Each structure stands twice: as C-alpha cells, then as structure tokens.
C-alpha cells in the first residue's frame, strides 16, 4: 500500500550553524527526532530508509546518520566541497556534485569510490537517480542536463577515463535549479525527466530516446520541481515563494498566465503561503499531498484536492536548506504488511567512510583487505572443523613440486630464447634501414 505524506516523516535541514536535522511527523506536526549536525546541512538525502546523508555547508565533508540514532554516525572528508547529494532508491549508490562541475559515485555499503568524472563546465546544482538506479541525472549552472549510465561510470575497466553522457539536454537559457524523475516507466523502461531553471521554464524529457516532450513557462524564476506518483501533475517552486501546480494531462493550449503573459499553460494554479524563496518540493506516493520548504523557515503540508495548508512545520533555525521524506513506519516500528516486519528484524551494518581516492583500473577488486563490508558464510566453521579432522599428513607421500619447477624453468628458457631472437631481428632491420637511407642519400640527395 502506498504511503501518503501524512504517513511520512519530514526531515528538515538548515544550513545555519549548530542547527540540527529535525524530523517532523507530517500527520501531527510533532517533532519525532533531532539529528545532531553541528555545522548544519546544505542538502540531504535518504539511502534505503536506513541512513541520512548530508553535506556540510562550506566544508569538504559529508556526514551520515542512522535513522534510529540521533548522534552523528560517520563523517567523511571529500576532495572538494560538495554542492549536491543524492542516493539511489535501493540504497546501492550515493553520488555528490561539486562547484567545479565534478561528480563522484560511491558504493553505499562499503564507501568505495566507484567513479569521479567531469559532468559540467560549471558547478553542479542538482542531481538525482532514476527510480531503478540505473542512471544518474545531473543539472548544472551551465544550463545543461545530463544523464549518465551508472554501469558505464562504475566499470573498473573505464576508471580514470573521461566519462561520456548518455543523454544531454542544453535547452535552458540559465542555470538548472532542479531535476526530478518520474516513477512510471513507459515502453522499454522509458522514464520522464523534468528540469526547472531560473529562466522560468520547466522542461520534460524522455530518457529513452532523449527527446524533449514538453516545455512549460511560469511567471517567475524556478528553484525546485517534483512530479506526483501518476505523473499527472508537475509542481514547481518559485523564488517568490509560490508553488505552481501544472496539470500535464490537459491540453497544452496557450492561455493567460498568472502575471498577464501569454506563455503559460491552461490550468496552472499557484499555491500561496510562503514569504521567501522555495528550496524544495516533495510529493507523496499517492499524490494526495505535497510538502514545500522555504527559506522563511517553514515547511507546509498541502492537500492537493483542496489546495489548502494542512500543517506548518517550523525549523528552529532559519533558513531551511532542504527536506526529505521517510516512511513513518521506519520510526514507529509498526509497518504495514511485511515491510515493517522486515525492517524490525534487519540489522544494519556500521556506516562506511566514503573514500576520496579512486582505485586505478589495474586493481579490479578496488578494495584493500581491511575495507568493504563483512561477509558471513553460514556453516563455514563447521566445514573447517570436519576438514581438519579428516586431514592426514604423510611425510613419505610423493610430491610434484620438483616437476613443476622443471616445467617453469623450461618455459622461462624458451621465452628468453624467443626474446633474444626478436632483439637480433630488430638490430638486423635497423642495419638494413641504415644502409637503405645511405643509398638514397648518395643517389638522390647528393647526386649532382
């Protein structure tokens, strides 16, 4: 059963100093937990409903909190100061972008750095994974939106090489401020990608064939966007504090816009309530509610049907920098069906330290003996005991080590002979080349 926003816990982060990441119950507006973040959080994401990953403002650091623990679990130092962060829905990958336009992808369980590549000419402003986790979508200050195949980025054989974008869209006139992906897959696994920009437009693309499906122009510069579960409505946040509700299933006829222009789409509605720029918009899974956050220090839970504010969630320290959603069953331990039971029985491993060094292509494993997650094989201790009891050492048993050494020496001698023969041929060809050059010089160059 899909969870609505009223069954979700809203994580609200602030970039202010000594401000915590506060978890609110969207149903009652009560504070559920406060996660320690001494330096604040410029952006955050949730990995598999188990860990909260945040980036510290003005620092080359990325922090990890367990959902069940309020204290900081792990802090990782990065090569550059991150400007955006995201995690795949299945919790397999974590990615970050920096102001230099560089992106990095880690394996979430071990912290191994899988790829580090130049994604944009200018800074990376926003990024997200597709619902299946097979592609990473990034947006930058250069106005470009790129989609990258995770399988190509994480290929060990291609480590250290320049990455090539799978899909690229460069239709925005100004920097991209937000990207999101639809949760409904079309034919062949096609996914809709939406981007918004300070040029007041939202653009909808097809990830399958790379075409631009639609463009919607709004009355003001946009900062964030979100799609509902059915991809029937697009929500975009503006710098003036308004949330624009844009129906996508209606006819794209041109009508008068909210500010008197002629380039808005018919049926656009503005949700008014915030007094400052919006920083994030999130949709519930069933599409009944949306949650918007603003720099005015408040997050509002809106009812989609009535377009009224249900709750106002206030962070102790403004401005708000980002929000994320976690199912409330993850906190209460009383899930619906098997979901809550699995979560209650599961034991999470310690949070890894995200590496800042990329393993070269020569090392296929990419892990040192002390790195990576622990692997437990049931029954291995019993098998070792049985093998040890059945092992008998015979000192007089014949061995084949001498024969193996003789074969190795013979193979080495053969290779050495072939090498000497090749070197002799090279010297012979050099001599022939020198004689030919001397002949040409005498007959053609020095001839009267």
Language model regions located:
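Conserved strand-to-loop turn within each blade of WD40 beta-propeller repeats
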Residues: 14-17, 56-59, 97-100, 139-142, ...
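Residue-level detector of Asp-centered blade-edge/turn motifs that repeat once per structural unit
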Residues: 3-6, 47-49, 89-90, 131-132, ...
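WD40-repeat beta-propellers
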Residues: 21-24, 62-67, 103-106, 145-149, ...
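Short C-terminal beta-strands that terminate individual repeats in beta-propeller domains
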Residues: 32-36, 72-78, 113-119, 156-160, ...
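Canonical WD40 repeat/beta-propeller blade segments in eukaryotic WD-repeat proteins
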Residues: 39-46, 80-87, 122-129, 173-184, ...
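Terminal intrinsically disordered, low-complexity extensions flanking WD-repeat/beta-propeller proteins
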Residues: 256-257, 266, 306-448
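Short loop/turn segments immediately following beta-strands, especially the blade-tip
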Residues: 149-159, 247-258
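Hydrophobic beta-strand positions that form the internal "hydrophobic ladder"
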Residues: 10, 52-53, 94, 136, ...
């Amino acid at each position: 059963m899909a969870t609505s926003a009223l069954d979700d816990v809203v994580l609200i982060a602030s970039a202010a100093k000594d401000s915590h990441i506060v978890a609110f119950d969207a149903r009652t507006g009560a504070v559920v937990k406060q996660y320690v973040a001494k330096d604040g959080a410029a952006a955050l994401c949730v990995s598999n409903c188990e860990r909260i990953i945040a980036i510290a403002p003005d620092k080359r650091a990325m922090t990890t909190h367990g959902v069940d623990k309020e204290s900081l679990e792990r802090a990782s130092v990065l090569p550059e100061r991150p400007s955006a962060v995201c995690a795949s829905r299945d919790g397999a990958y974590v990615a970050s972008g920096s102001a230099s336009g560089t992106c990095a992808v880690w394996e979430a369980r071990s912290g191994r750095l899988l790829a580090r590549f130049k994604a944009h000419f200018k800074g990376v402003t926003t990024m997200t994974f597709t619902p299946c986790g097979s592609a990473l979508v990034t947006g930058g200050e250069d106005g470009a939106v790129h989609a990258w195949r995770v399988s190509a980025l994480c290929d060990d054989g291609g480590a250290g090489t320049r990455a090539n974008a799978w899909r690229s869209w460069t239709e925005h006139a100004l920097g991209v401020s937000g990207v999101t992906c639809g949760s409904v897959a079309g034919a062949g696994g096609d996914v809709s990608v939406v981007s918004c920009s300070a040029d007041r437009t939202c653009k909808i693309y097809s990830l399958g064939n790379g075409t631009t499906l639609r463009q919607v122009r709004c009355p003001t510069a946009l900062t964030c966007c979100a799609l509902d579960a059915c991809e029937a409505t697009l929500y975009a946040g503006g710098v003036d504090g308004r949330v624009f509700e844009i129906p996508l299933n209606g006819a794209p006829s041109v009508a008068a816009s909210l500010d008197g222009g002629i380039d808005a789409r018919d049926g656009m509605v503005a949700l008014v309530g915030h007094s400052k720029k919006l920083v994030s918009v999130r949709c519930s899974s069933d599409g009944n509610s949306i949650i918007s956050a603003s720099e005015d220090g408040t997050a509002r839970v809106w009812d989609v049907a009535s377009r009224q504010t249900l709750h106002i969630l206030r962070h102790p320290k403004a401005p708000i920098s980002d929000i994320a959603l976690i199912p409330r069953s993850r906190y209460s331990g009383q899930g619906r069906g098997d979901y809550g039971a699995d979560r209650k029985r599961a034991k999470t491993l310690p949070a890894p330290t995200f590496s800042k060094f990329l393993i070269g292509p020569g090392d296929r494993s990419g892990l040192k003996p002390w790195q990576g997650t622990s692997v437990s094989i049931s029954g291995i201790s019993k098998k070792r005991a049985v093998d040890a009891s059945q092992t008998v050492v015979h000192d007089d048993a014949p061995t084949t080590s001498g024969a193996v050494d003789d074969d190795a020496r013979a193979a080495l001698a053969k290779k050495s002979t072939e090498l000497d023969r090749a070197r002799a041929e090279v010297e012979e060809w050099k001599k022939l080349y020198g004689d030919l050059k001397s002949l040409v010089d005498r007959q053609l160059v020095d001839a009267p």
